[in-house]
């Protein structure tokens, strides 16, 4: 009955809040612990080379912390309907190529080769440039963590959308649940020992894409994981 449905909805909301608090605590604790540890080491060593190394790690941890808080802030604004999209017409393929090329060094370090499939379609879409950048960065971070050596980027026309698909073989032993990749705080490592992932990147990305009038989906087929983003063509 109606009261039972309301009770179930309330329980689900409480569970989501609990998971959010647990996830947020875990994800903020990891970089803060690293910062605290290396600050203590800095106080104990005088070797210039070691101090430079520790400072670099501290800076990286601070950057991760800032990135996480930005994502949590965006997520809170989206879920409370306080965030409005600033939509513009732009070249989907040009934006994607520029963002991917900006990660060239990281792809090289991980030995991941990215191939862009040739296309002859007009990829002009309606999107918020800053939010699209956030979505693409999250997709790339996912690639860097789980891709096994290669990734392929393709575009296709599916009226009224232009579809971007990023497909990659996944590393052996990776536990990926396609049904859960867009859930808040889900990480492919179910034990949450993956200290590089906040677990909200793809969840936030899906919300952002939907806010731009598009769709975002994931698929796992024969060891190939693919993420698709559809934005309205102009």
Task: Identify the residue ranges that each predicted region occupies.
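Short helix-loop "hinge" at the ATP-lid/N-box region of the Bergerat-fold HATPase_c
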Residues: 142-144
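Short alpha-helical Gxxx[C/S/T] motif in the catalytic ATP-binding
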Residues: 201, 205
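Short beta-strand/loop element within the Bergerat-fold HATPase_c
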Residues: 150-161
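Conserved micro-motifs of the catalytic ATP-binding
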Residues: 80-85, 124-127
């Amino acid at each position: 009955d109606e009261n039972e449905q309301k009770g179930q909805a309330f329980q689900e909301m409480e569970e989501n809040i609990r998971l959010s608090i647990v996830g947020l605590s875990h994800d903020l604790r990891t970089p803060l612990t690293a910062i605290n540890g290396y600050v203590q080491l800095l106080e104990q060593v005088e070797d210039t080379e070691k101090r430079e190394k520790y400072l670099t790690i501290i800076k990286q941890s601070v950057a991760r912390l800032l990135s996480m808080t930005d994502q949590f802030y965006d997520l809170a604004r989206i879920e409370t309907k306080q965030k409005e999209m600033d939509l513009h017409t732009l070249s989907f393929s040009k934006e994607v190529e520029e963002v991917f090329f900006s990660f060239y060094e990281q792809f090289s370090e991980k030995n991941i080769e990215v191939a862009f499939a040739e296309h002859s379609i007009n990829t002009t879409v309606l999107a918020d440039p800053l939010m699209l950048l956030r979505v693409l960065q999250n997709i790339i971070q996912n690639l860097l963590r789980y891709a096994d050596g290669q990734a392929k980027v393709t575009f296709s026309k599916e009226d009224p959308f232009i579809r971007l698909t990023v497909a990659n073989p996944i590393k052996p032993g990776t536990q990926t649940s396609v049904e859960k990749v867009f859930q808040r705080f889900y990480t492919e490592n179910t034990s949450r020992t993956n200290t590089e992932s906040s677990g909200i990147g793809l969840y936030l990305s899906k919300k952002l894409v939907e806010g731009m009038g598009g769709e975002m989906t994931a698929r796992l087929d024969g060891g190939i994981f693919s993420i698709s983003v559809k934005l309205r063509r102009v």
